[in-house]
From Swiss-Prot:
The gene is kup2. It catalyses: K(+)(in) + H(+)(in) = K(+)(out) + H(+)(out). It comes from Rhodopseudomonas palustris (strain BisA53). Keywords: Cell inner membrane, Cell membrane, Ion transport, Membrane, Potassium, Potassium transport, Symport, Transmembrane, Transmembrane helix, Transport. InterPro entries: K+_transporter, K_trans_C, K_trans_N, Kup. This is Probable potassium transport system protein Kup 2.
Amino acid sequence: MALSSVEPTEAPRATGFGALTLGSIGVVFGDIGTSPLYAFREAVHVAAEGAPVTRVIVLGVLSLILWSLLIVVTAKYVLLLLRADNNGEGGTLSLMALGQRALGRRSVPLLVLGVIGASMFIGDSMITPAISVLSAVEGLKIAAPALQHYVVPLTVGILVALFAFQRWGTAKVASAFGPVMVLWFSTLAVLGLLHINDDPSVIAAINPWYAVEFMLSHGVIALVTIGAVFLAVTGGEALYADLGHFGRKPIQAGWLFFVLPSLLLNYFGQGAMVLAHPDAVENTFYRMVPENLLVPMILLATAATVIASQAVITGAFSLISQAVQLGLLPRFEVRYTSETHAGQIYLPRVNMLLLAGVLLLVLLFHSSSALAAAYGIAVSTTMVVDGVMGFVVVWKLWGWRPAAAAALIIPFVAVDAIFFSANLLKLMEGAWVPLLFGFLMAMLVWTWRRGSAMLILKTRRTEVPLPDLIRSLEKRPPHIVRGTAVFLTSDPEYVPSALLHNLKHNKVLHEHNVILTIETAQTPRVDLADRVRMESLGDKFARVRLRFGFMESPNVPKALVIARKLGWQFDIMSTSFFVSRRSLKPAAQSGMPRWQNGLFIALSRSANDATDYFQIPTGRVVEVGTQVTI
């Protein structure tokens, strides 16, 4: 279940190795840890095609699940990609930035891959809460069959409450995530151990020959089954995405010594139970639970799926925030839900869109079995993307020869490609849903990038080079007023439009003028020593560049305090910040199709105010409006 390109989710910061490992169990593995609710059941259903379940099917599916977890999650992510960190951070956009840094330039193919991976995550992040909570609540069908009609309404209620809760943040409850998930995984292990005794011969599925035999004997159905088996590894990419919060070794320890054994024990327990009691295949997970413990188990499963969903939601907020910083999307409103952890953020518009998408899926598909067909295509796409970008890192950054790097990465990409192909077979059954969401997301990114580039070209024609203006003002100085004026601009080589308008309409110039540019680095964070760069342009002008990492929240006043230490006499109370606000109008002749032009204008108008985004005191801001046709 996909934290696919999940860009790191926020978790309570802990310092000790044990605390970090516990924290990782609560956040990193919540997604993949709820897969036993439906993964084995769906794979067996697909393989059997309505016929009686055979021993070949059970052992074949179990062997496929085992070796998928070992190859895709353990070998690729835990042992390989966790080492490919970008200043300690992981995730698709971090990997993209790392690859571009390794190449020493902005690579269009890598950018496209990064956008595809991020877009697929947004599409998949709507399915994860829906299928997770649905699968947990469906336990009511066994505990109290008369309540089965309340499964969907109850699921909707839980999801609405979950998304409504986002505005208050998770800081107060996040500390409970680890213990709850430890209880969950321990329960999985105990249930599995108890039921392996139903048919101990199920252990034979450790032999990969059973997976091979199943694929050879079932033809096309085997490929379709692989698509269902993939449900067991979705969420594995979250191990890499959350690298920055917990570190490589705690995640590796949590996976290798606790989570992976618990998952395998549970899957093998489900398999043994089906071999002994074939009718249990209807809902293999809840049939493992003693009848008198069904209700507590449903409550625990619901808590686990809510935690897994929370990780995805937080990951979506983090991903969108990074995309904004990298210039892939307009500035969305960001609210900070914690005074101590800058990474705990809430994006109201994104939250509403996610909730709408999740509820639409629940009401459209009604059950986790139906949603399973829609699940996996986005994660498998992201895994292919991670593999390809991982090749660039191994080759360019780690210094491997191309042949050696290919020999290492190609087997993983080949396995990912098989899963991708298998999930494509489910296209008409529902896999089109995350693809549609991902396509819409990619369309927004493409439109914003294309429109922004055209806007720069459009305004460049009328802009004045900054050195030319300074020379002109030295020859004909205007009236000088006391104080400092800071002009925000995206291009420090040209005169900000707000400065031109101030000179044109007010006929004044401040005694100190700062041309301020805010840049986003290709690293998650920037050291304070590299935050500020100052350049004197004469007695009245200075050029200041502020650099932030793509995972940082840009705070201009705090950054300018650093400038004071570099010699700039800066007083916030005698400083005015001049911000240009462009009003876009559609041109008769545009370089984009009319629909895309209109979409770009709508995105531009929806962007959050620069004053709020850069956390500038509103009482010190002067906004200057300009109208631009595009």
